[in-house]
Curated annotation (Swiss-Prot):
Membrane-crossing residue ranges in chain numbering: none
GO cellular component: cytosol
EC number(s) recorded for this UniProt protein: 2.1.1.-
Organism: Exiguobacterium sp. (strain ATCC BAA-1283 / AT1b)
Main location: cytoplasm
Stored CDD domains: AdoMet_MTases (cd02440)
Name of this chain's protein: Ribosomal RNA small subunit methyltransferase G
């Protein structure tokens, strides 16, 4: 996906990119490739692949969830900033908090935000399980996002404790998500959530399946969740 195709694909979904936004995406790509030589941020470094598999893929969440109606977003395990920083570029009003367990990625994100002139962003080094217990973060966000971090049974325990009651958890998943969602039904209920919708689509060009899963946070998450760091992955809620 070259830049023109990127512009057209977003236009088809009702989003018109400004010159400022286009230059932010260009600089994002340049810094991603530059920093990737020093640290392992991504296996995808070809310009057209980055625009498709990182930028467009991240923004696809906005085709199925209205980010104009929310203010605070927490992105769990964002790595090099996906999906929340492309969403921040598209929706500058968002206040974005990223939690990532690797400190070197936080260093990159701080430099990136500076270079792109992004305000209203905060990057924290640590585990989602720790932040879910912290009163400053627990049930404080309108939306919690995650892309390709873990299976839904695990991901729900990372993310739902951070979403406020009445808020949402938006997961960006690859193919065959229906089995995951069936397995996660009880975990979502235990943690105070319920699946609202799963939107399936094909990534343009390569036509690989993607899914945007939207979960409503209906009730407070019981105090014992999330469990201590490492437990959700080892012993998923079923």
């Amino acid at each position: 996906m070259n830049e023109s195709q990127f512009i057209e694909a977003l236009r088809a979904e009702g989003f018109e990119l400004s010159e400022t936004q286009l230059s932010q995406f260009k600089r994002y790509f340049e810094m991603l490739v530059e920093w990737n030589e020093k640290m392992n941020l991504t296996a995808i470094t070809d310009r057209e692949e980055v625009y498709l598999k990182h930028f467009y893929d991240s923004l696809s969440a906005a085709f199925h969830f209205d980010f104009t109606k929310v203010e605070t977003v927490c992105d769990v395990g964002a790595g090099a900033g996906f999906p929340s920083l492309p969403l921040k570029i598209l929706f500058p009003h968002l206040h974005v908090t990223i939690i990532d367990s690797l400190n070197k990625r936080i260093t990159f994100l701080n430099e990136l935000a500076l270079a792109l002139g992004l305000e209203g962003v905060a990057f924290h080094h640590g585990r989602a399980e720790e932040f879910g217990k912290n009163k400053k973060f627990r049930e404080q966000f309108d939306v919690v996002t995650a892309r390709a971090v873990a299976r839904m049974t695990v991901l729900a325990e990372y993310c739902l404790p951070l979403a406020k009651v009445g808020g949402s958890f938006v997961a960006l998943k690859a193919a065959k998500v229906s089995d995951e969602m069936a397995d996660a039904k009880n975990a979502l209920a235990v943690l105070g959530g319920k699946e609202k919708a799963t939107h399936q689509f094909l990534l343009p060009g390569e036509m690989s399946e993607r899914n945007i899963v939207v979960v409503d946070k209906l009730r407070k998450t019981p105090g014992k969740y999330p469990r201590k760091a490492g437990t959700p992955a080892k012993e998923p809620l079923i």
